[in-house]
Regions:
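Alpha-helical scaffold segments that mediate packing/assembly in large oligomeric complexes
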Residues: 105-187, 334, 343, 349-350
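Short acidic, glycine/tyrosine-flanked loop/strand segments centered on an H-E-D-like triad
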Residues: 82-109, 276-277, 281
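Assembly/oligomerization interface modules of large self-assembling protein complexes
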Residues: 35-97
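Divalent cation-coordinating acidic motifs and surrounding scaffolds
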Residues: 185-188, 192-194, 209
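Structural recognition of the beta-strand scaffold that forms the well-ordered cores
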Residues: 58-60, 100, 202-204
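Extracellular/periplasmic catalytic domains that process cell-envelope and extracellular macromolecules
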Residues: 50-51, 195-197
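Sequence/fold signature of self-assembling virion shell proteins
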Residues: 2-32, 36, 155-183, 201-202, ...
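Short, solvent-exposed loop/turn segments at the edges of secondary structure
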Residues: 92-94, 198, 299
Length: 351
């Protein structure tokens, strides 16, 4: 079957129309694979004011003081107390993407592709923000190598799975750092409002690692909870003070002989998501066929795109720890329609 390219994509084609006439078209759009967006739900939302002239802001954190347990002596002034103030910078960058389409495609194609482009690009924008946050917080300084391994390399060489001892160590690290447990999570893409949950630390885990968690002593599936009214989206179960939500977008390092999975366990205010005040959403941009100057002299090209401001920052390293492990069932993404790596009969790339 001949393929013909138009603008930003390749359509399944016959002649000059980009439409195959030998079969009846069904306007039903089959569901495509999308990622679960999660990392901004547990972030402290921060905003840089628009028109402020800066892309970077900073805030201060004052360290707590030790108890003053020495009794005062009459008439003697004690030594003054030193205070330590830490500065934390956070910044944003701009991200965006677009798809072009031709006038012939707009005229002859039977599908409402512009509506589909908008939907697909919206998913891409959300995934972009999720990955930006994920990559920042997955690079923190607090790390537990599964099964008493001493490095990522020994996690791989020893085929170290996540263990009860790793979860105990993660929870104790957060408790001893006096990290606050989550009692509510952000709700909605604008991060305005929150949903109450049962007090706990939160672990974000890849589905492959979830299967190893289910084998651990003390693991509790969500169907075994005494109360199910406050189950978080994509929550799969809990162990001790940690409630786990699974996410196919969890960080996986594939540089070694085996994939290493990053399970993040965190308390409240461990990290921030950063945007620009008044521009914290995604701006969808539509350029119709009659837009542009001499570069589009014959009104042959239009486009649909998005752009947004996004950033992330670890606010307190002590409030977050990552567990690095391999997985027993190392099931890869065999077909990923979302990132165009799958091979499907009659599939075409739109260029």
């Amino acid at each position: 079957m001949a393929l013909q390219t138009y603008g930003g994509f390749t359509a399944q084609a016959n002649s000059m129309t980009g439409v195959e006439f030998s079969k009846l078209y069904n306007p039903l759009h089959l569901k495509r694979v999308t990622q679960m967006m999660m990392f901004d739900k547990y972030a402290l939302a921060q905003f840089i004011p628009a028109n402020s002239g800066v892309k970077t802001m900073f805030c201060f954190r004052y360290r707590s003081l030790k108890p003053a347990t020495t009794p005062l002596t009459e008439g003697v002034l004690p030594t003054e107390t030193a205070i330590v103030r830490e500065k934390v910078d956070y910044t944003v960058a701009q991200y965006g993407s677009f798809i072009k389409y031709s006038d012939q495609l707009d005229t002859f194609d039977v599908d409402n592709m512009k509506a589909q482009f908008t939907d697909i690009l919206g998913d891409q924008a959300a995934l972009t923000g999720d990955v930006v946050i994920r990559d920042v917080i997955s690079a923190g300084t607090r790390v537990i190598y599964a099964g008493s391994a001493t490095s990522r390399a020994t996690v791989i060489s020893g085929t170290k799975l996540i263990e009860v001892g790793d979860l105990k160590l993660a929870a104790l690290n957060l408790k001893n750092a006096r990290a606050e447990k989550f009692k509510a999570i952000n709700s909605g893409s604008t991060k305005i409002g929150s949903t109450p949950i049962r007090s706990a630390y939160v672990g974000i885990v890849h589905p492959n690692v979830v299967e190893d968690l289910r084998n651990l002593t003390g693991w509790k599936n969500i169907e075994d909870y005494a109360y199910t009214s406050d189950i978080m989206e994509n929550e799969v179960g809990s162990w001790g003070d940690i409630r786990f939500v699974e996410n196919t977008n969890a960080k996986v390092d594939t540089a070694g002989a085996k994939p290493v999975y990053i399970t993040l366990v965190m308390g409240k205010d461990a990290y921030a998501s950063v945007s620009v005040r008044g521009k914290n959403g995604t701006e969808m941009i539509f350029k119709p066929l009659n837009s542009g100057g001499v570069e589009n002299a014959l009104n042959q090209v239009g486009s649909v795109g998005w752009k947004m401001y996004c950033g992330a920052k670890i606010l307190n390293e002590l409030f977050m720890v990552r567990i690095e492990s391999v997985a027993t069932l190392d099931v890869g993404d065999l077909i990923r329609y979302a990132d165009n790596t799958g091979t499907v009969s009659d599939a075409t790339t739109i260029e």
